[in-house]
Amino acid sequence: MEWTDDGIVLGLRRHGESSAVVELLTREHGRHLGLVRGAAGKRMRPVLQPGNTVRAIWRARLDEHLGMYAVDGLTLRAAELMSASHGAYGVTHLASLARLLPERDPHEDMYFRLEHALDDFADAGAAAAHIVRFELAILTELGFGLDLESCAATGETSDLIYVSPKSGGAVSRTAGAPWADRLLPLPPFLRESDEDHGWSDQDLLDGFRLTGLFLLRHVLEPRGQGHSDAREGFINAVTRARTRLTRA
């Protein structure tokens, strides 16, 4: 068995003195692990950092085997990612989200979403918006997508400003007014018609509150998990970074 694919490094664990089992989110083969010999060496160590994009050749005698990776770096962005205060938290959290996907199950859209997020990570606000959208996409990929395109009560497609915490459906301003205190805010940057809309600090926090609720309910708690410490660390780091920018 052999294939070649591009992949984003999610993490690795040491195997013996110089090798490592490397976890990639690949474009065509999904989340996939393989053994890399010499992973601890000077040449491979900087290549196999989380957040980097690599070209990987996977070989195994049988498809169900762990197999071996031969890896070359394509986009080595890890050092730049880690230079930002929110970088390490963000990369760690994105990796934990990607690990919710079934192993070896292709999710090409998620690969491109992750790559796009990592390429636009320098600005703390943009990074936060990307992660909220990535969390939303993870829910969709796992079968728990939110319907944010039309009002759950009336079918309207405009003036959608709420989300029902029960159904996960959008609610228009008029339909939601009597129950506004029971509904979740729908940040403008998550509405399909406002994808290029900017975001305030409150918009970002509302986005994390929205996706966080449904991730816990439908994905994490059924697995006996909670939100990662990296998620909270990322949100706090972004808040501090944007506060410093506002005061400057």
Curated annotation (Swiss-Prot):
Lineage: superkingdom: Bacteria
Signal sequence, renumbered to the chain: none
Alphabetized Gene3D superfamilies for the sequence: Nucleic acid-binding proteins (2.40.50.140), Recombination protein O, C-terminal domain (1.20.1440.120)
Gene Ontology BP, a term: double-strand break repair
GO annotation, cellular component aspect: bacterial nucleoid
Sequence intervals crossing the membrane: none
Key words of the record: DNA damage, DNA recombination, DNA repair
Function, as annotated: Involved in DNA repair and RecF pathway recombination.
Family per record: Belongs to the RecO family.
The protein's name in its UniProt record: DNA repair protein RecO
Organism, scientific name: Bradyrhizobium sp. (strain ORS 278)
Highest classification ranks of the organism: Bacteria, Pseudomonadati, Pseudomonadota, Alphaproteobacteria, Hyphomicrobiales
